[in-house]
Design a protein with these regions (language model features):
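Glycine-rich phosphate-binding loop of ATP-dependent small-molecule kinases
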Residues: 1-218
Length: 218
């Protein structure tokens, strides 16, 4: 059997399993199940989510994408807006620009001390423990590319296709800056990867293998 046919067979079987699991989740009114999708902008975060919208029943899927706090959000505790945006039980939620993003970008750009970052991550861990106590299941994904892919961004005019997705988190940065992002992400993982909400590294140079891997995790 060719590699293409093998992958197609795996994908079809996985889709059936996922649809069955989604039905059972909705029927039991459990969850929600949240997928926090983080990592390199060019690792296919949006494409990964689109794949699950193709595979699953869209009626029970939700996507949350966050920019900087606006309006009343600025007056409330930092994690408040994430709490109030939780999707209902029995559904699956994809989060881009989650509660990790702003502290992570501030640390990687030297705008936040490690002490402050550690304090922020302690708050996040308490928040996630609270979510778990309320029945929420968390799956935290860090999509990464090998060095050849990660360190060679396309020209600005080619980046427009990614900007149009309204899901670009990091903006344009150099190889050195990306190295700092990875260092900050390692620190983040050390502080917040727990039994109930571990960080999972997802190799993303091969999009189809990436999608199958995440689908099996689900």
């Amino acid at each position: 059997m060719s590699k293409h046919k093998s992958l197609k067979k795996q994908r079809e079987a996985l889709c059936e399993d996922l649809l069955e699991a989604q039905f059972e989740l909705q029927k039991a009114n459990l969850g929600p199940v949240l997928l926090l999708v983080s990592g390199n902008d060019l690792a296919g975060k949006a494409e990964l989510i689109y794949t699950f919208y193709e595979w699953l029943d869209n009626r029970y899927l939700n996507t949350r994408a966050f920019t900087l706090p606006q309006g009343i959000e600025r007056k409330m505790p930092r994690l408040w807006r994430y709490w109030r945006s939780l999707p209902p039980a029995g559904t699956l939620g994809f989060y881009l620009g989650s509660w990790y993003h702003q502290p992570l970008i501030q640390l990687s750009r030297g705008r936040m001390s490690d002490t402050r970052f550690k304090s922020e991550m302690e708050q996040v861990t308490r928040f996630e423990n609270q979510l778990a106590a309320e029945g929420v299941t968390l799956l935290k994904l860090w999509l990464h590319l090998d060095d050849d892919h990660a360190q060679h961004y396309p020209p600005r005019e080619q980046q427009k296709q990614y900007d149009s997705l309204a899901m670009r988190e990091w903006g344009e940065f150099s190889t050195t800056e990306y190295t700092k992002v990875r260092e900050a992400a390692k620190r983040m993982s050390e502080l917040t990867s727990t039994t109930i909400a571990p960080w999972i590294q997802v190799a993303s140079s091969d999009a189809e293998a990436r999608d199958l891997y995440v689908g099996k995790l689900l």
